[in-house]
Swiss-Prot record:
Its EC number is 2.3.1.-. Residues 1-149 form the N-acetyltransferase domain. The lineage of its organism: Bacteria, Bacillati, Bacillota, Bacilli, Bacillales. It holds the Pfam family Acetyltransf_1. SUPFAM superfamilies: Acyl-CoA N-acyltransferases (Nat). The gene is yhfO. GO terms for molecular function: acyltransferase activity, transferring groups other than amino-acyl groups. This is Uncharacterized N-acetyltransferase YhfO. It comes from the Bacteria.
Length: 149
């Protein structure tokens, strides 16, 4: 298994995995939209995508979004997406992607990686905790949906 940073030319091959990831979160299938979204993020250097590849097949990915902490005056990466295809979930790809994300963040001067997952997603929560992530009980997170104008 090889973990590497995605290039813009990988967007079409990552799109089916990204589409499955979105479907897990109850979004309608949109393969064309998935590819366009990924391509735009990569072209505009708005995210970093790390991919797990085995025998020429993409079996997983994680997507990191850069942001900053005003308090610490340091970079933070938001690990927004992590997905491994079902037939490869026992091969350690998720852990290897998390390790690669940690290495990438460290090499780029980040203070930390943050992420969120659904409360009921016990498998993901267990994986994150096995890889050193701790639930942040010191802060409350809010979300405001903004209507399009």
């Amino acid at each position: 298994m090889n973990i590497r940073q995605a290039k813009t030319s990988d967007a079409a091959a990552i799109a089916p995995l990204f589409n499955q990831y979105r479907e897990f979160y109850r979004q309608a299938s949109d393969l064309q939209g998935a590819e366009a979204f990924l391509k735009a993020r990569l072209e505009n250097h708005e995210s970093v995508i790390l991919i797990a590849e085995e025998n020429g097949e993409f079996i997983g990915f994680t997507q990191l979004y850069p942001t900053f902490s005003s308090v610490s005056m340091k970079r933070i990466y938001i690990l927004n997406d992590l997905f491994v295809v079902p037939h490869a979930r026992t091969k350690g790809a998720g852990g290897r992607l998390l390790s690669a994300a940690k290495d990438y963040a460290g090499q780029n001067g980040a203070k930390c990686l943050t992420l969120q997952t659904e409360h009921h997603n016990r498998k993901a929560r267990s994986l994150y905790e096995q890889n050193g992530y701790e639930e942040d009980t010191g802060f409350v997170h809010y979300c405001l949906n903004v209507p399009a104008k």
